[in-house]
Curated annotation (Swiss-Prot):
Pfam families: Trans_reg_C. Residues 4-103 bind DNA. The keyword Transcription regulation applies. It comes from the Bacteria. This is Uncharacterized protein YgeH. GO terms for cellular component: cytosol. Keywords: DNA-binding, TPR repeat, Transcription, Transcription regulation. GO terms for biological process: phosphorelay signal transduction system; regulation of DNA-templated transcription. GO terms for molecular function: DNA binding.
Length: 458
């Protein structure tokens, strides 16, 4: 059979068949031989209808004369393959006529690098809530996006993605079908409200385009958020790291792994881990030619300097100056994302520029980036300004989103030690005694920031 066009078939039970003859279910793959594949494709093209034996033979064997036994052997082989993966009785024999594929199947194209269209895959959301089926939300979101009929945007059906629930199966899908974008998400309960946290990712180099969190019953807003960010990337390609060279895909993936390792060290929030994070970020910005990654490294290095100052490992004024010098590297960039704005809000806030900090934080919120970090930065600035209740609210929100980030846990413990003074005197606030030397150092250094001469950004 002539297989000129790239395509794939998707079955409701999570099976996927590609034109190379690979049948996939989750992490399992089975190869279908060429003749059997030809027979199967003829049946799939007429799924639900009877296909005459002579028509199958003519389509697969073309001008070669073969007996019915050759077709019978192919049908038997196909049935054995499907039965092995638990998908039996899908090929029916219609007495004295032919065969029929009785399962429901969807046919999709495989996105080619040279096409002007763009495609998106929505992977299954994860949740620990027993009262919610995330696949229902996935299906609704797929339907909403596809029903909007955005010119040039192809949405993969749930039949293609509903078994892509881990990194192995997702990476397999990405490498075989090559969508332009994909969406991942998780559902958590936040103050008794079921909230969907999503990330829109450029599939070519695994770079985060945008993230957001919305109540699960606001899927129309979620779909519009996804579409808007895709359209901005398509119509303003300078926003997208897809401009990175195609042959650097593996290198970019490796650099992204290094970035994640550096962030993990920073999140651990010990002096030793922060020094390790600085080494990683400095090495990354020196060897990467991706401007967005270099910019993020500068901003994270700025946060590292301020974090070391809070631990008493460097002078606060010197740390603030170094942080601001690093931000000078990104000040000329015309398009900045929420991560950059949020870190700039932190540095300016801890440098005494409250109004500038507030504006930057508000802009970061609009650009919808790492919300947990945004709340963490705002908590530090509120703590610095002795707005303890506001700091407590922000750090609690940060921990609700990312409970495993130790830096937020430490600041939460510090904030909880800082309480109103019950005595009627000029000292409105004081902090309780603590056995933790590191906590005392952090609190003391946050208070010392108030004594610094205001440092202005150049």
């Amino acid at each position: 059979m002539d297989l000129e066009n790239k395509f794939s078939y998707h079955f409701l039970e999570g099976l996927t068949l590609t034109e190379d003859g690979i049948l996939t279910q989750g992490n399992e793959q089975v190869y279908i031989p060429q003749k059997e594949l030809g027979v199967l494709i003829v049946l799939l093209e007429s799924a639900g209808h009877v296909v005459l034996k002579d028509m199958i033979i003519e389509s697969v064997w073309k001008n070669i004369i073969v007996s019915d036994e050759s077709l019978t052997r192919c049908i038997y082989s196909l049935r054995c393959i499907f039965e092995k993966i638990g998908y039996d009785r899908c090929i029916e024999t219609i007495y004295r006529k032919g065969y029929r594929f009785s399962g429901q199947v969807f046919k999709t194209k495989i996105n080619e690098d040279n096409t002007s269209d763009y495609s998106i895959a929505i992977f299954p959301f994860t949740t620990s809530l027993n009262t919610l089926d995330p696949l229902i939300l996935n299906q609704e979101l797929v339907q909403i996006i596809s029903n909007k009929k955005i010119d040039g945007l192809y949405t993969y059906p749930m039949a293609a993605t509903n078994f892509c629930n881990d990194h192995i199966s997702q990476n397999s899908f990405l490498s075989r079908f090559k969508p332009d974008y994909f969406v991942t998400g998780r559902i958590n309960q936040n103050n008794a409200v079921n909230t969907l946290y999503i990330e829109l990712i450029d599939a070519k180099n695994l770079f985060l385009i945008a993230s957001n969190h919305l109540p699960v019953d606001e899927l129309h807003n979620t779909s519009q958020f996804i579409i808007d960010n895709i359209l901005q990337t398509v119509h303003k390609p300078e926003r997208s790291v897809r401009l990175a060279k195609q042959d650097q895909g593996y290198k970019n993936h490796y650099l992204s792994d290094e970035m994640l390792a550096g962030k993990k060290e920073l999140y651990d929030f010990t002096p030793e881990s922060i020094y390790r994070a600085m080494t990683i970020f400095d090495r990354l910005q020196n060897k990467s030619d991706i401007q967005t990654l270099k910019t993020e490294c500068y901003c994270l290095l700025a946060e590292c300097h301020m974090s070391l100052a809070l631990h008493g490992k460097s002078e606060l004024e010197l740390a603030a100056q170094k942080a601001l010098e690093l931000l000078d590297y990104v000040s000329d960039i015309t398009t900045v994302d929420g991560k950059i704005l949020a870190i700039m809000g932190l540095i300016t806030g801890l440098s005494g520029q409250a109004k500038v900090s507030h504006i930057l934080f508000e802009q970061a919120k609009i650009h919808s980036t790492d919300i947990a970090s945004l709340y963490y930065y705002r908590a530090l600035v509120h703590f610095h300004n002795e707005k303890i209740e506001e700091a407590r609210i922000c750090i609690d929100k940060s921990l609700q989103l990312e409970p495993r980030r130790r830096k937020a846990v430490v600041i939460k413990e510090c904030v909880d030690m800082y309480v109103p003074n019950p005595l009627k005197n000029n000292i409105k606030l004081y902090y309780k005694e603590t056995e933790s030397e590191s906590h005392r150092v952090i609190i003391d250094n946050i208070l010392k920031l108030k004594q610094l001469t205001r440092i202005c950004m150049r």
